[in-house]
Amino acid sequence: MKLCIIKPPLPFGWTPVAPPILEYLAALTRREDPSIEIELYSASATPDVFDDLQCDLAAISLLTPTAVPGYRIADALRARGIKVVVGGIHASTLPEEAKAHADAVVIGEAESAWPEVLRDFKAGRLQPFYRGEQGELDDLPTPLYGLLKHGHDFRIVNTSRGCPYRCTFCSVRPYFGSRIRLRPIDHVVRDVEAIPGNMYINGDENIWWLGKVDRAIDLFSALRGSKKKWMGFGSLAPILSPEGSRMLAAARRSGMLTVWVGWESISEDGLQAYSADRKVGEDRERAVKTLKDHGIDVSLFFMLGSRADSLEDYKRAVDVADRLGVSMHPSLTVPYPGTELRSQYEPYLFKELGWEYYTGAYALFDHPDPAMTPEVREEMFYETSLELLSLGRVLRHMFKVPASGFPHAHILSLMNQLPVRKGMKIAFEKWKASKAAVRQKQALGGSGSLPAR
């Protein structure tokens, strides 16, 4: 039996980060049945292989921005007689939609469902739906690092799942649950040591949690022995906690160079509308400065154009970047299926816009301010983004990276920002080419139109 595991192409080009589901699902497969031949495909790196792909079973992992190309790949493979299983957050949220393009859909986490999928396929009794449980994380296999080729330089390690925060825009809590589930620290160290190369990404939704700072310190202390450099996603609330400085010192000693922070909104009103104010803490600018004081570079991710935002928020974004000396990466607000934000924005959605537009580069809903038309929101988004990612600004930021991280953190700053800059330029060209068609869809408004595809 031959299995192909596929990650559909990203909207705006290739990334040096290996999609973690590929090598991890390969490890789950190898543990269940070592006789299965496995091939991995990241479609962003190998877009032209699917016409001639030969396998018995294809597994495709879907996010909302990759759902449409993922469905196209699935439809083409099924037309050639290849059985297709789909999973991931998008398929789990909309299983009936996904089933129209697949022989089976895995809803939820893979660990408990995937062995049953493989056994049923080999027995010729593949079921239409499989439901994975939110189980404990004390027996996860080490991903088959290195099985995926084609120049993916960074691997991702996960140490936890779940999130207690109630940010309205986020899919993590609906998919992984509100309880924080932690992996054994020695298992995390084992996976880090197995990664090829000397740098990796911690892919957790949050690398440090309020109330679990001691666990973060223990993890960072254990990782110090790997002598590898890393970056990860972290919230701001724990930074100013009583143990925050000790935690940051341990993180820096463990090789941490950069933290990606969900700034979420430029305005306080926007933060509260997203229910994200608890996550960022009471003094987020001081928290960012504290991170930098500990030698950790900071990249902020935030959204523009929500129904709570104003035109001034676009202009203020560049000021925040200059004032804090950080890189900033905006997107337009996306009400993903299954989120609370989706429910809130349902009456205002431009429902003619299918999932291919859910990339963070299009206005997807009506705005209460007549001045915030879809075209204005998009134009100002690109104006702001291209300014924040201008080559001069990228280079200037590199010289603001804490000196204690030289040279790795400075090289990493370029490796982080240059692919994003390239992707934004691709997005800008796509946007210009599609403007007329998108305006027609947006003009139909949020009522009386077809449901999003």
Each model region followed by its residue ranges:
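Radical SAM enzyme core and accessory elements
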Residues: 1-8, 14-15, 34-40, 53-56, ...
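Conserved beta-strand positions in the central sheet of alpha/beta enzyme cores
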Residues: 59, 106, 171, 201, ...
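Flexible glycine/acidic-rich beta-alpha junction loops that bind and position SAM and/or redox cofactors
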Residues: 12-13, 95-97, 211, 269-274, ...
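Acidic, low-complexity intrinsically disordered segments
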Residues: 1-196
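Radical SAM [4Fe-4S] cluster-binding motif and immediate context
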Residues: 141-299, 315, 319
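Structural recognition of alpha->loop->beta junctions
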Residues: 97-116, 250-259, 316-330
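Acidic-and-aromatic substrate-binding clefts and catalytic sites of carbohydrate-active enzymes
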Residues: 46-48, 208-213, 237-243, 306-310, ...
